[in-house]
C-alpha cells in the first residue's frame, strides 16, 4: 500500500513538472475512488483552467500585435502626408500653395487626433476603467447635440437631414450614448455622396426602444456586413477617411449599456443602423 501510494505521489509530481514546463495536454482524469484520485482530479481541473488561460493569453498577444500594427499603419499615412507637405512648404513661395499645404497638414493632424482620442476611449472601455451611469435620459436632446457638429459638413455637401424621431426615455449614460451616435453619424456621412440624405426615426416596442439612423449612400457588401463592427476593419466601400474604429467604439458602448446595434444594408442604396435600448436588462 505504501509503495502504491508513493508511486501515485511520484506520478502526480511528474504531472506537476510537465504542467510547469507548459504541457497542458495531459490525460490525468481518474474515475476511481480514494484521496489520491480526488487530488488527481483537482489537479486536472487546475490544468484545464491553466490551459484555457494560456490560450486566452496567446490570443490576447496576437490581438495586441495586430492592433499595434493597425495603429502604426493608421498613423503612418497622415504622418507621411505631413512630412511631404512640410518639405514642399520649405521651398514654396506662392502664398496660395502654402495655405493649401498648411490646410492639408491641419486635416491630417485632426485625423490623427480623432484616431488617438477614440483609441484611448475604447481602451478605457476594454479595461473597465470607465464607470457607466445608469440614469434616465431622453434620446432627442442627445441626438440633437450629436448632430450639431455635423451641420456645417452636411450644409457644405448639401446632405439633407430628416429628423422624424418620436422622443423616448432610456436608461444609460448620456455622454457615452452621444459618442456612439456621433460615430455612426460620422460613418454615414463619410459613405454618403453630396446631395444625399440622412434620416432619423424611432420605434417603440414593449421590450425596447430603437433609434434608426439611415443614409442613402454606397451601402455595404454582404461579405463586409458581418465584419463592420470589428476594429480597424476596412470593407470594399470604406471611405478613404475611415480608420475603422468608430463603429467598433459605438458597438462597445451599446453593449456596455446592455443594448445593441443592428445594421441592414443594400449595396448602392444605403444602410440603416438600429440602436436598440432595452427597457429592462436582458
Where are the regions that the model predicts?
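Short helix-loop "hinge" at the ATP-lid/N-box region of the Bergerat-fold HATPase_c
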Residues: 187-189
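Short conserved segment of the HATPase_c
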Residues: 220-233
Amino acid at each position: 500500500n505504501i509503495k502504491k501510494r508513493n508511486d501515485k505521489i511520484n506520478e502526480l509530481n511528474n504531472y506537476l513538472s510537465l504542467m510547469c514546463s507548459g504541457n497542458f495536454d495531459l490525460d490525468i482524469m481518474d474515475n476511481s475512488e480514494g484521496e489520491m484520485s480526488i487530488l488527481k482530479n483537482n489537479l486536472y481541473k487546475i490544468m484545464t483552467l491553466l490551459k484555457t488561460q494560456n490560450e486566452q493569453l496567446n490570443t490576447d498577444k496576437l490581438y495586441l500585435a495586430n492592433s499595434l500594427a493597425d495603429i502604426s499603419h493608421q498613423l503612418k499615412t497622415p504622418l507621411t502626408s505631413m512630412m511631404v507637405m512640410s518639405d514642399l512648404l520649405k521651398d514654396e513661395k506662392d502664398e496660395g500653395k502654402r495655405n493649401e499645404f498648411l490646410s492639408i497638414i491641419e486635416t491630417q493632424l485632426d485625423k490623427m487626433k480623432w484616431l488617438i482620442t477614440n483609441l484611448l476611449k475604447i481602451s478605457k472601455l476594454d479595461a473597465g476603467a470607465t464607470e457607466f451611469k445608469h440614469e434616465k435620459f431622453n434620446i432627442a436632446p442627445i441626438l440633437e447635440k450629436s448632430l450639431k457638429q455635423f451641420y456645417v459638413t452636411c450644409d457644405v455637401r448639401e446632405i439633407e437631414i430628416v429628423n422624424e424621431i418620436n422622443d423616448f426615455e432610456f436608461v444609460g449614460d448620456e455622454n457615452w450614448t452621444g459618442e456612439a451616435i456621433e460615430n455612426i453619424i460620422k460613418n454615414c456621412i463619410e459613405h454618403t455622396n453630396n446631395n444625399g440624405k440622412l434620416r432619423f426615426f424611432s420605434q417603440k416596442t414593449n421590450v425596447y426602444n430603437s433609434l434608426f439612423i439611415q443614409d442613402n449612400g454606397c451601402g455595404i457588401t454582404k461579405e463586409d456586413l458581418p465584419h463592420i463592427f470589428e476594429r480597424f476593419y476596412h470593407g470594399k466601400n470604406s471611405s478613404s477617411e475611415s480608420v475603422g474604429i468608430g463603429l467598433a467604439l459605438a458597438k462597445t458602448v451599446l453593449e456596455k449599456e446592455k443594448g445593441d446595434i443592428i445594421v441592414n444594408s443594400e449595396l448602392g442604396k444605403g444602410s440603416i443602423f438600429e440602436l436598440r435600448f432595452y427597457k429592462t436588462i436582458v
